[in-house]
C-alpha cells in the first residue's frame, strides 16, 4: 500500500503485488464453512425416528402380543439406557484416536439392532433387542452434539437453525405416521423406521469433527 500526494491531496493506492498477500491473509483468518446440510440431516433423521418410536412403539409391542406388564418393562429400557449410554459412549470416543469412528459404529449398531425387530420375537428376544437398540440409539446424540459445536466456534447463533431440522423431522413423522399406520397396520412400523436409521448412518458417514484452525 502506497500513500501518494498530488497537489496536497493524498490517497491510498494498493499495488497489484500486495493483493495476493491480502487475499491469503483473509483466507487464513476467515472461519471454515459450516457443513449445515450434513449436520441438519443427522438431526432430521434422528428425531424423525424418535417421532415414530415414542408414540407408536408401545402399540407395536402390543401388536406383537405383549401385555401391559411386558410393554412397561420393555419401554423402561429406553429410559434406563439413557442413564448410562451417553457417558459410556462419549468416554470411549474421547479416548479413541479417531472418535468419529464411534459415532459411525453407534449408528451402525442402531440400524442393525433395530432391523431385528422385523423378525417374529417373544419377550426374551424383544428384551435383548431393546437393550442393544436403546443403548446405541441413546449413545450417539451427545457425541453428535459435540461434533456440531466443534463447527460453531464464535458462531453459536447458527446452532438453532441447524438443530431445528430435528424438530421438523419429529413433527412430520408423528403427524404423518398415524394416518399411515391406520391404513397399513402397526405391524409395518419397523419397516417404515428402517429407512430413517439408514439415513442416520449415511449422515454419520459423511460427517466429522471440525478441523482445528491455527
Regions found by a protein language model. Name each.
Residues 28-82:
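Helix-loop boundary and gating motifs at the non-cytosolic
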Residues 44, 113-117, 123-141, 147:
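Hydrophobic core of transmembrane alpha-helices in multi-pass small-molecule transporters
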Residues 79-87, 170-171, 175:
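Residue-level signature of mid-helix packing/kink "hotspots" within the transmembrane helices
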Residues 84-98, 181-182:
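Helix-to-loop junctions at the C-terminal end of transmembrane segments
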Residues 97, 119-124, 207:
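Helix-breaking motifs and short loop linkers at transmembrane-helix boundaries and internal kinks
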Residues 101-115:
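Structural signature of the two symmetry-related core transmembrane helices
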Residues 188-205:
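Symmetry-related core transmembrane helices of the 12-TM Major Facilitator Superfamily/SLC fold
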Residues 205-214:
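Flexible cytoplasmic inter-helical loops of multi-pass small-molecule transporters
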Amino acid at each position: 500500500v502506497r500513500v501518494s500526494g498530488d497537489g496536497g491531496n493524498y490517497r491510498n493506492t494498493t499495488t497489484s503485488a500486495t493483493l495476493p498477500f491480502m487475499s491469503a491473509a483473509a483466507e487464513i483468518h476467515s472461519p471454515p464453512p459450516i457443513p449445515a446440510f450434513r449436520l441438519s440431516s443427522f438431526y432430521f433423521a434422528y428425531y424423525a425416528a424418535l417421532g415414530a418410536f415414542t408414540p407408536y412403539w408401545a402399540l407395536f409391542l402390543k401388536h406383537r402380543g405383549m401385555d401391559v406388564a411386558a410393554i412397561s418393562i420393555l419401554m423402561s429400557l429406553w429410559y434406563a439406557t439413557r442413564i448410562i449410554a451417553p457417558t459410556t459412549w462419549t468416554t470411549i470416543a474421547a479416548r479413541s484416536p479417531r472418535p468419529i469412528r464411534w459415532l459411525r459404529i453407534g449408528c451402525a449398531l442402531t440400524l442393525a439392532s433395530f432391523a431385528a425387530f422385523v423378525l417374529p420375537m417373544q419377550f426374551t428376544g424383544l428384551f435383548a433387542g431393546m437393550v442393544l437398540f436403546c443403548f446405541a440409539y441413546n449413545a450417539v446424540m451427545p457425541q453428535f452434539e459435540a461434533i456440531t459445536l466443534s463447527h460453531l466456534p464464535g458462531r453459536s447463533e447458527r446452532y438453532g437453525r441447524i438443530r431445528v431440522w430435528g424438530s421438523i423431522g419429529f413433527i412430520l413423522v408423528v403427524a404423518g405416521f398415524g394416518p399411515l399406520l391406520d391404513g397399513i397396520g402397526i405391524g409395518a412400523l419397523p419397516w417404515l423406521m428402517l429407512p430413517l436409521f439408514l439415513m442416520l448412518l449415511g449422515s454419520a458417514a459423511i460427517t466429522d469433527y471440525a478441523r482445528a484452525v491455527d
